[in-house]
A protein has these predicted regions:
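Periplasmic/extracytosolic POTRA-like scaffold domains at the N-termini of outer-membrane
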Residues: 21-60, 108-133, 137, 172, ...
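Extracytoplasmic segments of membrane-associated envelope/inner-membrane machinery
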Residues: 75-153, 160, 166
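Extracytoplasmic/luminal low-complexity segments enriched in Pro/Gly and acidic/polar residues
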Residues: 172-222
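Buried hydrophobic packing residues in well-ordered domains
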Residues: 20-22, 33, 56, 62, ...
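Membrane-embedded segments
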Residues: 53-83, 102
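Flexible glycine-/small-residue-rich
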Residues: 24-26, 79-83, 108, 121, ...
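Aromatic-capped interface at the extracytoplasmic side
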Residues: 1-23
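Short, glycine-/polar-rich solvent-exposed loops and beta-turns at beta-strand/coil boundaries
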Residues: 49, 67-73, 110-111, 151-152, ...
Length: 222
């Protein structure tokens, strides 16, 4: 809870803003939000709440904001912050992103300690949520082992697991391929094996690369 008690909007009107209360923040820049609010002149009765809402929501970390007037002289702002889901790499920079692909803020990866999913590839943030949804529906345990996802040539995904296993998904029918992958994991104990790559780009087939060569493994459609 943050409360600005001074009156930055000078005037004698009885409904002039004298208090600004900001709630729901943890990582948002409160000074930035405060300054954005104090730029508005007027009283609570004639204040443009949509404009304030838009400006507050343009601040880093703020996903949504609700604005409420509390007569006679208080403006109450409640913010909902973005929830970092992954780290997106683009042109040598690192960004925190939400599951829906919203870029939250740029970070220095060397100073960031949270263990988040790595995301690479053009257009990958916008398509991340659908990928995670497909995995959660067909092979939910896989989300626990995901370390990095990369959108290749703006058409398909590569998945890298925390044991460095690489999974190449096809352009289409991702859910079916994930079902096949789940079957393969169950039958071959993949995480404990010497398999280093599973290529699922050809529907109904899995090309397995192991440490000492490459073998083919047929998977019937489920």
């Amino acid at each position: 809870l943050y409360q600005l008690k001074s009156n930055p909007l000078k005037g004698d009107n009885s409904f002039q803003i004298k208090n600004v209360i900001i709630e729901g923040y943890e990582k948002s820049n409160i000074s930035e939000i405060e300054n954005s609010v104090t730029e508005f002149k007027g009283n609570l009765i004639g204040l443009n709440f949509n404009s304030i809402k838009e400006i507050v929501e343009s601040s880093e970390w703020v996903k949504r904001a609700s604005i409420k007037k509390v007569l006679p002289s208080t403006l109450k702002i409640n913010v909902t912050e973005n929830d970092p889901y992954a780290i997106y790499f683009q042109e040598g920079k690192s960004f925190l992103i939400d599951l829906d692909g919203s870029i939250i803020t740029e970070i220095n990866l060397n100073n960031y300690e949270d263990d988040l999913l790595f995301v690479r590839g053009e257009n990958s943030p916008e398509l991340l949520e659908q990928l995670i949804r497909d995995i959660s529906i067909t092979f939910p345990n896989l989300t626990q082992t995901l370390e990095e996802v990369e959108f290749i040539e703006k058409r398909r995904w590569n998945l890298k697991l925390n044991n460095k296993l690489l999974v190449k998904l096809p352009d289409e029918n991702i859910q079916q391929s994930l079902k096949n992958l789940k079957q393969l994991f169950e039958e071959q104990e993949v995480m404990e094996s010497n398999i280093i790559e599973i290529d699922l780009r050809i529907q109904g087939r899995a090309a397995l690369k192991v440490l000492d060569g490459k073998i083919n493994y047929g998977i019937d459609e489920i």
